[in-house]
């Protein structure tokens, strides 16, 4: 049974979101275990996916407080470690088993670059509770709660509770049932451990009541928990005043206590001092404020709490000046430099020469200096003198005055705030129309509320304990009674005079009795109730909430926790939710000030929009080749509470952050009623809108009964009226509420997941329409609500006919709430509602147009303000079978695909599609957007990825899919071009059958199902591709698999070209779309640089062999052609292609099983052996055969003898910008060194082959980078080839042993190999020490720009170019590392790492070179010789393919030379080396994931900036990185 959720971690260990739901919490869905599940079955398994090579994987550990088994109790601060086993190329999954609901966390520890252990922050996730009523599971979104205030229930609770049950509420919320304090407020608890004795003699009585509510009324129970305060007359405070904030536990409040006392004194003496005792107007208030300034602030001398008492300090200095101090203090050496700057001295003294807690308010004059230390300072700045004369004291006084200056400013600011707060509060209490207008000032009702509760403790001490309250826009993470706040002094607290704020401290040790008492309180309630409502949660210290909720869950694991949380910040809300494990946050509909705002709230809590995209992991995860597959996996068996995967590929469901779950209240016991805030009539539509939301919902008793006013929890003494029988039509909206709650139950039964329920909200004037849909069945409920926010709203406003597209509907009921009487005069005994009646509305005109598939609803003439109409709807084409049908069958449909046919399904750039379709096909055009870059599924996926993530229903593609079925038809019909390929018909049939179902759906559902179908098929194709490749690919990471998928991108069958002139076979494109068709598709150099990565590492041995043999056919002049053109008109202008060809043959022989057999393969030769150029249809073409062994020898022998020819068909028809001399090709070996030299200043025969072509700049025919001479990479490849043939010769696999030189002599391969070995370092290395130049053939006169490097060229036509730093040396290092002195190599690599390495590519020239031009723009036609027409193609732009060679060299030489880069056994790379490689691939991972081409670009501009003229996906860019991974697999892995 699958109950796993996958959570991806970033390189920093942070969870990665898979969908954008805004601010959110990682929440595990409440899906109950089957009844027969074993006890040790986890509720969930959270699988943490750590990427291979991630920095956090280096010596990485996951630490979690998830208990290791079901028998181990949860302890929040007990962490268990799990080892991260990921390697560089294989991810790791760490399982966190969750056995009970609650809040859990994990963090990671790892070794960082500095060899220090580092830890991440803690990451939290919440497992929601499983609620049951009489063994019936209750989803959280089905909760319908009603609050009751227990003291208003009277002596007989049964009638009210029965009424609540009759209204189909399934949870009752009790305000605190404990004994109340003197104010009689339920939230001012007299004794936390004693229930209200009027109703309950013992906790057992409460338990019996709750059991009755469960058993007989079919409801759950929830009670308030009050952590933050206790009643001001709680008797236990007298014995334990340390439980509050007083002058002993919180000395920083002493000044606030004194201020409060003086305000009370002033209040008592108003009359005797001649101030008004009953404020009539603002002038009276001004008089009062003047009195406060004089009699309160004037007498208090509050500045003594802030400033240093200068006179006292001076007396102490004078008295102790000559004391011999036992302690010597050290001061900064430069202290004398500021001896005359009293401001700087004061700052130093304040920070360094004061007593502890300086600056914190405490007792009067508690801000003091350290006198002995200050005396030493004064003597030091007075040159050590012992004089205690007036001058020293004057200096001290000046310093202390400066110290005091900012302290007095603080005092002034605080006093100003005190006056401001007092003015506003007294004005509210006494004068404001919206305030209580308290009347005369008396002893019982003082001028302003007392901030402190005063009493004599049991120890005889007089105590003043801070009362609790709240602060406007306060930071909930700061305790406003702590020393970090001056809120009590500044009178910023809106105080509750009947509640003493509780002081928990940091842990139970700080207030043992309080923690023990509250623990008993929590335990008692957790054993009885099903849920807690955390009162005033935003003021609850988080560590306190964690402690007590953990304790509560010990006794009730499935405790439902709701919170009153008004932090003012979504981020802070999420913090409380994840730390405390809050199930739902209370949200209030009555806070809406308009219909528009209410519709916004309903939209927020109503569910996802109808037609929302469903997450499907298209290219988000690697697909292990042996992954579990189950074609029935998507079938939802009602008896199996598994967490369903999204397709038959059994990747676990993804855990991603979602907004905190809401308990959306139509009205709370703290809200003004509709009668007060809006109108009576608005009660009904407001309730209906809330009822249909995809959240828990709630109400307060009296809302349904139309109570007129917000009832005061303190002063209200009446009881609920129980005289009217349940269900009577005169009782408000109770009848409708019962029906609405019943509807909610039916909706919520199957809505476990956030994707299961969708809605649409529309606001138009007084009307709000709300459509709630069950995604799986297509059944829905449509509400038309006409609001009445004000009696002044236009009664004649109408709603146009409502049109429901492709849905049928029928009226379920419609009512209007009418007020039939005035507010009932005050009843001394009972709380009664306003007389109303529900009027049933009729006359709706509902029609269905079968031809248009639309339903139309026309409202009756009578649909007054305060009306609702509820309709049942059914979407066309949607039923319980649809979801399973869509998600199934794709595995079977893709089972016959080959890599070639997968290319046709997934890829095909537009030029390729045009080529195959003879110009008929092409990419799909999305209006107002453009074309996807591929015609196949990858084109859709690249567009859909962000659309799905952001649920972008307004995207042009979403609109296009709603407007018609063109994209569906296109996706099927384009595959007709490939119908003869393996498996294509099966894929077409699967698509056709699924799309046929989709075409029957409402148009607004088409985008979602289209994306789902595309995503599922794409995933199955991708999995099939991985299964068809080598085992290493199947074991590897998403990044490696994405690189390997580019192999499929690049190799396909074209009509316009091939690798053979007479046979249409798959050929490798150099890149897409620039090099996709005709003669521009296949390049010898590109093919053989790419062959190892694209074809051999992926296990595509047949394709590799075909390319090798096809190019072997075209060997001419001892060269492999650059442009192949299917062998029709090959061009031989590349000096390096033959060497990359030989390297590819070597790789083939060593990688492919029995690979050496290819050496004896016969190839027919395109040209005669005398190099005569003939057309492809000449009878002599392909008339002679050679073995590949002979081809290899021919390349070596022709180079040894020297090559000199003029290109066939030379002239402008062959190359329009080449000068005449450029067509002359020359190559020779310098037999004094064994190095191959070649080329001229008129051509560019290496991969850096950009020819100048700007007439405006005068660069036509002048190569940007001729690189004539001995190019370093060619000679590295030569060395590799010689080593290869020597090894073959030694094995008896190569019959040749020597070659003829240009002077007629002969040289053995072994001699040539040694000659290169002896001369390479001497000719290429540029020593760091100039004194060694002579040993390395370095001429400083030629302008050595950088040392410690390997030159790019030797003996080029421009001598300074010899010493240029380019990245080509890494190629030589990779293929022939034996040529390099390791210490030199490491230095050169380090320099290149710092100088040449960009985010994704290697800079093609040292940025310090005056020729460096890093921005390539081929369209530029300027007079700039260096850049016009892109002549700087290889003069700074950052090429990606070289990055792979660089990292291969980086790995080889670091592992070889650095112990830090080796494991303990020195057999494998250390985690440090893997981390270094991983870090350097960060840009590539990001690029390939974000690229719409799903590949790596050819090149970038400076620092990885996108180059618009670059081919966006290039074969060698991906291939050379796959080469790196193969190096590691081959060297260090057991299997392949």
UniProtKB/Swiss-Prot annotation:
Catalytic activity: Transfers a segment of a (1->4)-alpha-D-glucan to a new position in an acceptor, which may be glucose or a (1->4)-alpha-D-glucan; Hydrolysis of (1->6)-alpha-D-glucosidic branch linkages in glycogen phosphorylase limit dextrin
Signal sequence interval, chain numbering: none
InterPro entries tied to this protein: 6-hairpin_glycosidase_sf (IPR008928), 6hp_glycosidase-like_sf (IPR012341), AGL/Gdb1 (IPR010401), AGL_central (IPR032788), AGL_euk_N (IPR029436), AGL_glucanoTrfase (IPR032792), GDE_C (IPR032790), Glycogen_debranch_met (IPR006421)
Disulfide bonds listed in the record: none
Pfam families cross-referenced by the UniProt entry: GDE_C (PF06202), hDGE_amylase (PF14701), hGDE_central (PF14702), hGDE_N (PF14699)
Activity modulation notes: Activity is inhibited by IGD1.
EC number(s) reported in the record: 2.4.1.25, 3.2.1.33
Location(s), subcellular: Mitochondrion; Cytoplasm
MF term (GO), any: 4-alpha-glucanotransferase activity
Entry annotation: catalytic residues: 535, 538, 670
Gene Ontology CC annotations of this record: cytoplasm; mitochondrion
Principal location class: mitochondrion
Lipid biosynthesis is among the record's keywords: no
Keywords (A to Z) from UniProt: Cytoplasm, Glycogen biosynthesis, Glycosidase, Glycosyltransferase, Hydrolase, Mitochondrion, Multifunctional enzyme, Transferase
Its biological purpose: Multifunctional enzyme acting as 1,4-alpha-D-glucan:1,4-alpha-D-glucan 4-alpha-D-glycosyltransferase and amylo-1,6-glucosidase in glycogen degradation.
NCBIfam families named among the record's database cross-references: glyc_debranch
UniProt record similarity statement: Belongs to the glycogen debranching enzyme family.
Comment field (misc): Present with 125 molecules/cell in log phase SD medium.
Annotated protein name in UniProt: Glycogen debranching enzyme
Organism this protein belongs to: Saccharomyces cerevisiae (strain ATCC 204508 / S288c) (Baker's yeast)
């Amino acid at each position: 049974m699958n109950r796993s959720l996958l959570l991806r971690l970033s390189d920093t260990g942070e969870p990665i979101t898979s969908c954008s739901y805004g601010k959110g919490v990682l929440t595990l869905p409440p899906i109950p275990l089957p009844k027969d599940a074993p006890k040790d079955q986890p509720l969930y398994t959270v699988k943490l996916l750590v990427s291979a090579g991630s920095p956090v994987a280096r010596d990485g550990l996951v630490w979690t407080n998830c208990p290791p088994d079901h028998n181990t109790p949860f302890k929040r601060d007990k962490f268990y470690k799990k080892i991260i086993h990921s390697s560089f190329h294989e991810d790791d999954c760490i399982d966190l088993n969750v056995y009970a609901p609650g809040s859990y966390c994990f963090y990671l520890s790892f070794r960082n670059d500095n060899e220090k252990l580092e830890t991440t922050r803690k990451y939290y996730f919440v497992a929601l509770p499983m609620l049951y009523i009489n063994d019936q599971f209750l989803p959280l979104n089905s909760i319908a709660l009603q609050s009751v205030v227990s003291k208003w229930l009277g002596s007989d609770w049964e009638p009210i509770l029965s009424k609540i049950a009759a209204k189909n509420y399934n949870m009752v919320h009790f305000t605190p049932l404990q004994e109340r304090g003197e104010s009689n407020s339920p939230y001012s608890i007299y004794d936390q451990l004693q229930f209200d004795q009027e109703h309950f003699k013992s906790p057992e009585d409460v338990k019996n009541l709750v059991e009755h509510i469960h058993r007989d009324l079919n409801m759950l129970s929830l009670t308030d928990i009050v952590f933050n305060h206790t009643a001001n007359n709680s008797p236990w405070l007298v014995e334990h005043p340390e439980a509050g904030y007083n002058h002993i536990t919180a000395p920083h409040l002493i000044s606030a206590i004194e201020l409060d006392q003086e305000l009370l004194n002033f209040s008592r003496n108003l009359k005797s001092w001649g101030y008004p005792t009953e404020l009539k107007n603002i002038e009276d208030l001004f008089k009062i404020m003047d009195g406060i300034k004089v009699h309160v602030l004037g007498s208090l001398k509050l500045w003594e709490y802030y400033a240093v008492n200068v006179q006292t300090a001076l007396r102490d200095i004078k008295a102790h000046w000559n004391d011999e101090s036992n302690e010597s203090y050290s001061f900064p050496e430069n202290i004398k430099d500021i001896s005359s700057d009293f401001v700087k001295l004061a700052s130093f003294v304040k920070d360094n020469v004061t007593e502890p807690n300086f600056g914190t308010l405490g007792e009067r004059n508690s801000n003091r200096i350290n006198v002995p230390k200050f005396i030493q300072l004064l003597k030091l700045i007075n040159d050590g003198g012992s004089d205690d004369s007036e001058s020293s004291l004057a200096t001290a006084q000046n310093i202390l005055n400066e110290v005091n200056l900012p302290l007095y400013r603080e005092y002034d600011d605080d006093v100003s705030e005190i006056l401001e707060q007092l003015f506003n509060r007294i004005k509210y209490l006494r004068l404001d129309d919206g305030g209580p207008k308290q009347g005369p000032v008396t002893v019982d009702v003082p001028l302003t509320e007392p901030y402190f509760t005063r009493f004599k403790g049991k120890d005889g001490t007089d105590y003043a304990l801070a009362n609790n309250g709240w602060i406007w826009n306060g930071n909930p993470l700061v305790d406003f009674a702590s020393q970090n706040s001056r809120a009590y002094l500044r009178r910023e607290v809106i105080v509750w005079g009947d509640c003493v704020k509780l002081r928990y401290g940091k842990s139970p040790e700080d207030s043992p009795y309080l923690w023990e008492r509250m623990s008993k309180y929590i335990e008692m309630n957790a054993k009885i109730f099903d849920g807690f409502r955390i009162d005033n949660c935003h003021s609850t210290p988080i560590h306190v909430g964690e402690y007590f909720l953990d304790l509560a869950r010990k006794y009730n694991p499935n405790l439902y926790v709701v919170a009153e949380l008004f932090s003012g910040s979504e981020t802070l809300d999420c913090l409380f939710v994840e730390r405390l494990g809050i199930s739902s946050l209370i949200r209030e509909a009555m806070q809406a000030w308009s219909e528009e705002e209410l519709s916004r709230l309903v939209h927020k809590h109503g569910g996802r929009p109808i037609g929302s995209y469903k997450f499907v992991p298209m290219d988000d995860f690697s697909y292990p080749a042996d992954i579990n597959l189950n074609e029935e996996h998507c079938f939802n068996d009602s008896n199996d509470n598994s967490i369903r995967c999204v397709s038959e590929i059994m990747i676990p469901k993804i855990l991603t952050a979602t907004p905190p779950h809401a308990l959306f209240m139509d009205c709370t016991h703290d809200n003004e009623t509709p009668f007060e805030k809006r109108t009576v009539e608005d009660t009904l539509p407001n309730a209906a809108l809330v009822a249909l939301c995809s959240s828990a919902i709630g109400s307060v008793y009296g809302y349904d009964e139309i109570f007129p006013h917000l009832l005061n929890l303190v002063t209200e003494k009446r009881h609920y009226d129980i005289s009217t029988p349940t269900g009577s039509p005169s009782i408000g909206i109770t009848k409708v509420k019962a029906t609405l709650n019943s509807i909610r139950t039916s909706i919520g039964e199957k809505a476990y997941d956030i994707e299961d329920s969708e809605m649409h909200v529309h606001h138009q004037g007084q009307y709000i329409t709300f459509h709630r849909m069950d995604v799986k069945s297509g059944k829905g409920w449509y509400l038309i609500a006409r609001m009445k926010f004000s009696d002044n709203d236009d009664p004649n406003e109408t709603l146009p006919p409502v049109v429901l597209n492709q849905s049928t509907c029928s009226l379920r009921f419609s009512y209007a709430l009418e007020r039939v009487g005035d507010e009932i005069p005050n009843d001394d005994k009972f709380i009664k509602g306003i007389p109303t009646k529900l009027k049933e509305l009729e006359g709706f005109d509902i029609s269905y147009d079968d031809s248009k598939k639309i339903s139309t609803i026309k409202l009756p003439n009578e649909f007054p303000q305060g009306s609702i109409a509820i309709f049942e709807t059914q979407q066309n084409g949607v039923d319980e079978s649809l979801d399973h049908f869509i998600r199934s069958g794709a595995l079977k449909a893709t089972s016959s695909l080959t890599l070639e046919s997968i290319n046709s399904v997934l890829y095909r750039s537009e030029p390729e599609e045009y080529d195959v379709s003879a110009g008929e096909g092409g990419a799909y055009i999305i209006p107002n957007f453009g074309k996807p870059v591929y015609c196949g599924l990858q084109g859709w996926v690249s567009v859909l990825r962000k659309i799905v993530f952001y649920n972008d229903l307004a995207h042009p593609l979403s609109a296009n899919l709603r407007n018609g079925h063109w994209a569906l038809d296109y996706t099927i019909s384009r595959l007709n071009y490939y119908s003869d390929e393996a498996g294509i018909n099966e894929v077409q049939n699967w698509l056709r059958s699924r799309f046929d179902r989709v075409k029957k759906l409402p148009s607004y559902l088409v985008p979602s199902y289209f994306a789902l179908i595309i995503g599922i098929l794409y995933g199955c194709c991708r999995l099939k591709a991985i299964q068809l490749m080598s085992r290493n690919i199947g074991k590897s990471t998403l990044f490696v698999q994405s690189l390997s998928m580019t192999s499929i991108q690049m190799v396909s069958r074209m009509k316009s070209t091939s690798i053979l002139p007479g046979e249409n076979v798959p050929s490798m494109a150099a890149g897409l779309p620039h090099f996709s068709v005709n003669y521009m598709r296949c390049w010898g150099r590109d093919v053989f640089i790419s062959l190892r990565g694209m074809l051999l590492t992926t296990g595509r041995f047949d394709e590799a062999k075909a390319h090798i043999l096809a190019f072997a056919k075209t060997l001419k002049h001892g060269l492999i052609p650059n442009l192949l053109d299917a062998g029709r008109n090959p061009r031989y202008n590349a000096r390096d292609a033959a060497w990359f060809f030989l390297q590819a043959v070597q790789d083939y022989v060593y990688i492919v099983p029995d690979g050496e057999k290819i050496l004896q393969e016969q190839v027919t030769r395109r040209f005669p052996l005398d190099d005569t150029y003939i057309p492809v249809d000449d009878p002599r073409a392909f008339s002679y055969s050679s073995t590949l062994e002979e081809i290899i020898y021919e390349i070596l022998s022709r180079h040894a003898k020297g090559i000199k020819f003029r290109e066939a068909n030379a002239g402008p028809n062959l190359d329009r910008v080449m000068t005449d001399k450029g067509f002359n090709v020359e190559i020779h070996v310098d037999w004094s060194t064994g190095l191959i030299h070649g080329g001229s200043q008129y051509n560019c025969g290496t991969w850096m082959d950009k020819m100048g072509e700007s007439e405006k700049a005068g660069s036509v025919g002048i190569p940007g980078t001729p690189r004539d001479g001995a190019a370093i990479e060619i000679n590295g490849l030569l060395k590799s080839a010689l080593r290869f043939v020597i090894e073959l010769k030694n094995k008896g696999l190569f019959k040749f042993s020597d070659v003829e030189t240009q002077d007629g002599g002969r040289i053995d391969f072994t001699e040539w190999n040694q000659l290169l070995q002896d001369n390479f370092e001497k000719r290429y290395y540029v020593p760091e020490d100039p004194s060694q130049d002579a040993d390395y053939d370095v001429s400083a006169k030629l302008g050595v720009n950088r040392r410690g490097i390997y030159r790019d060229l030797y003996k080029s036509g421009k001598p300074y170019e010899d010493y240029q730093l380019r990245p080509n040396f890494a190629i030589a290092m990779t293929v022939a590392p034996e040529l390099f002195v390791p210490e030199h190599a490491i230095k050169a690599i380090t320099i290149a790492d710092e100088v040449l390495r960009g985010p994704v590519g290697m800079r093609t020239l040292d940025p310090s070179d005056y020729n460096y031009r890093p921005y390539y723009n081929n369209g530029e036609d300027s007079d700039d010789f260096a850049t016009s027409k892109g002549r700087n193609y290889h003069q700074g732009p950052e090429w990606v393919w070289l990055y792979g060679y660089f990292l291969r060299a980086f790995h080889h030489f670091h592992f070889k030379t650095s112990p830090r880069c080796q494991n303990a056994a020195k057999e494998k790379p250390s985690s440090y080396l893997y981390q270094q490689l991983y870090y350097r691939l960060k840009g590539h991972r990001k690029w390939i994931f974000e690229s719409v081409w799903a590949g790596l670009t050819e090149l970038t501009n400076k620092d990885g900036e996108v180059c618009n003229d670059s081919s966006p996906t290039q074969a060698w860019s991906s291939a050379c990185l796959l080469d790196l991974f193969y190096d590691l697999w081959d060297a260090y892995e057991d299997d392949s």
